Regions:
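Family-specific signature for flavin-dependent thymidylate synthase
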Residues: 1-259
Length: 259
């Protein structure tokens, strides 16, 4: 699962999300003081502290976290990840590269699952050979005049993709909480941990572990008999989870930075 990159396309959106959240919460208590638009704008631009944000995000009123969307780009994750993450449909929108309109002949690449990355070279070669064979057949079909959409059925699930995800802060926290659980697939966990890491860096209060992480970080596991029985420390931030669960990726990242 190396060579997967994530980026927040509208970093300003997090600041606006915080401001809108505070404004919406204050509005419920100051309706009697607002006589005109000028009064409303004064309330909107009223300053606030990080403690104010902390108090509001801890309340059981998620609507105030839904007045802004944060857009994230994911480059290099597989189309299998696409199939999994798009199960989330509330307050979230997606735009993906298209097999119908794109010609991947000579340009396609495939993701390597973390389990295969850890395996012996012989196993890695079997996987790579299988994926490359599929991509070669795809290119051959396109060269024979088959349309890209039809030829796309020959591509492997591991085909790398480009995906844009736009969601409210509340929905990001919901998706991250569900998809960073240790019962999820490695690729989905890795992508969502990287996204969480970027969001946490910009707003460690809004995306704190006890508000964003899997059930075991927020309180206790809700999977009951399906629990992995290996809870994540409530103190860990996303980078700590990546280091503990995916050390091979961290070593490769460090090595690439040195190079």
């Amino acid at each position: 699962m190396d060579h997967i990159e994530t980026a927040i396309l509208n970093c300003y959106g997090i600041r606006e999300a915080e401001q809108n959240m505070v404004f919406a919460a204050r509005l419920t208590q100051h309706g009697h003081t607002i006589q005109n638009m000028a009064d409303l704008m004064d309330l909107y631009h009223q300053s606030y502290s990080q403690k104010t944000i902390e108090n509001i995000v801890g309340l059981p009123h998620p609507t105030v976290q839904k007045f802004m969307v944060i857009t994230v780009a994911v480059v290099g994750a597989s189309r299998r990840f696409l199939a999994q993450i798009t199960r989330h449909q509330n307050e979230v929108k997606y735009m993906s590269a298209s097999l119908q309109y794109s010609n991947y002949s000579g340009h396609a690449a495939f993701a390597i699952p973390y389990g295969i990355m850890k395996a012996d070279k012989e196993i890695q070669d079997i996987y790579k050979k299988s994926c490359q064979s599929d991509l070669d057949h795809y290119a051959e079909l396109c060269a024979l005049g088959i349309d890209h959409d039809s030829a796309g059925y020959a591509t492997p699930q591991g085909l790398r993709n480009v995906l844009i995800i736009s969601a409210t802060p509340y929905q990001w926290k919901h998706m991250i909480g569900q998809r960073t659980c240790r019962r999820n697939t490695d690729e989905t966990r890795i992508v969502m941990l990287h996204i969480w890491q970027r969001l946490y860096k910009l707003s460690p209060i809004l995306f704190a572990p006890d508000l964003t992480g899997p059930f075991c970080q927020r309180g206790s596991c809700m999977e009951k008999q399906m629990s992995c029985q290996n809870p994540i420390s409530k103190l860990w931030i996303p980078s700590d989870i990546l280091k503990a669960d995916y050390p091979l990726l961290i070593r490769r990242e460090v090595s690439s930075h040195k190079d």
